[in-house]
Amino acid sequence: FIVETLMAVYRHNGLLKGSIISATNAHRLGANEAPPAIISSFLGKQLTDLLKSLEESYDDALFNLKGKKALKLDIPQIPELLLDNTDRNRTSPFAFTGNRFEFRAVGSSANCAAAMIVLNAAVAESLADFKERVDRLIAEGMDKMKAIVKVVREDIKTCQPIHFEGNGYSEEWKEEAARRGLDVATSAPKMFQQYLAPESIEMFRKTCVLNEAEL
């Protein structure tokens, strides 16, 4: 679920920014301890290491083939792991803290409905896409757990550009984000245009949330 949430944020980082933007919020973002105007996600060291291990490990290191197949990630229980390693990077607009993601770019007095509509639709699209790809591999004869791990690995690699652990206020990050292909627009009208991007229209259509005329 974490990986597919990251995929949603990666695919639609520009639209997520469009969902929270206003003239006043555009002025606020990137200053006065507000998150920067580039959407990225902070995970913290242990989750980052876990995803890296999952991406790079050989199948034999991940699976116990004696009896029932099961993942062997060699980590403590997830709730304890995360609660003990809550690292609050305040410069991240979309951070994992403790046991949840926080989308911090919404203005403090703003209605969060638009942001929630976009975020929920984007995650729903990612989860549906994940299931379709896993089902396709299973239909081709692959073991269910191996199919899941294969798709998760692919998505960990694909969404790497959205993952950033550093200082979101730095000029270096703005340049790096542009190189990664992330949306770096700072103009509110340009951010609003993300609602009419082909990938946004398709996402809302597939999830039956909004049609093109409504957008």
What are these regions (language model features)?
Residues 9-215:
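Acidic, glycine-enriched catalytic cores built around paired aspartates
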